[in-house]
């Protein structure tokens, strides 16, 4: 039950802006902000947009060789809504998930997360006067394919104008499944179907993610349905 609740928390955090329209999304404020997340699963490729890239970013560059005149060098930033190659400098691939960025994150992408390092942060920024909330996702280091994000801690900061609640996640190796342990949990909502991997099946067997192969399902009050899956030789199919 505890593992199920933890997986639900992770799924909820990484889908926190699923129903937010593009024109309501915050602007990406930092180079390591994730502007979109894509996931490949049974239903195809699911896109979750998280923040809007600035149309144009300008950096002052020195002109000519005398290095006395500075002029802006501007480049247009866009957030990809389609799957990129694993080597693309504006995306980070983690197994069936890919994180998109407005600008080059090559330095972060090449740094593999250490055991105790915070790998990912979700920051909820609330404007006190209006109670308006904005959520930004920060990427700190590369989490390899057979690893997962595990909730670590929450930090809260309040000043005269804003409240910021930051949830941190570590990068942890996905363990091998024990016995009839649940290997994946999927959540289905009106416009989305997303999957979280819990453990790896033995003998290179693939944990399913088709709802028809689910071991069990739970429908929540908000209409969403959570499916639990087990490794193929232990799965009991339900209608």
UniProtKB/Swiss-Prot annotation:
Tissue: Expressed by the venom gland.
Domain of life: Eukaryota
Record keyword Methyltransferase present: no
Localization, UniProt: Secreted
This protein's GO CC annotations: extracellular region
Sorted UniProt keywords: Disulfide bond, Secreted, Signal, Toxin
Modification after translation (UniProt): Contains 9 disulfide bonds.
Signal peptide: 1-16
GO molecular function list: toxin activity
Family, as annotated: Belongs to the scoloptoxin-11 family.
Full protein name: U-scoloptoxin(11)-Sm3a
Biological source species: Scolopendra morsitans (Tanzanian blue ringleg centipede)
